[in-house]
Amino acid sequence: PKTTDVLEHTTFLRYENNKVSDIISVETKDFVKADVKVSYCVDFDTKYMDKWFSVDNYVKYLCDRVRSLMKREAKKYTIEEFYQNYSDIVRNVAIDYQDTASETESGHIGRFFPENGMFIKDCEVLSIRVESDIAEILDEHQKDMVEKSLELTNAESRVKVAEALFE
């Protein structure tokens, strides 16, 4: 996760294609903790150039805001629901998918921060790590579901063959 322990001070701001990585720690509604590793692609809107430096540390600001939103969102799901859909859930929160069906007031698609003209134009969800004992249960459940799905497909195929032979 990002911290302010070691900062690099510079007078240079790259305004396009900034890569910011973070690890977001969340807790689901059934009190299971998970860590999600993400990578954001961030741009700064040139129309907001006068606000680019209004936030002292844009990386910290970005990570803190998205972490807060993500912690609130994760509380809506059980660990099973979250684990199965974490990539979409995290990405939709990070880029503000519900509001990006149309362009934002800045003219860009993505989560926009008017405080400093920054916007997240993409979010890559890299991995999830769940408490080991819970991860084992989830993996076993997933394995059982795949086995049952294959058994069902096999049974349906046999029924179709039997029906075809009967006709």
Task: For every predicted segment, state its role.
Residues 4, 8-167:
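Elongated, amphipathic alpha-helices that form coiled-coils and helical stalk/scaffold elements used
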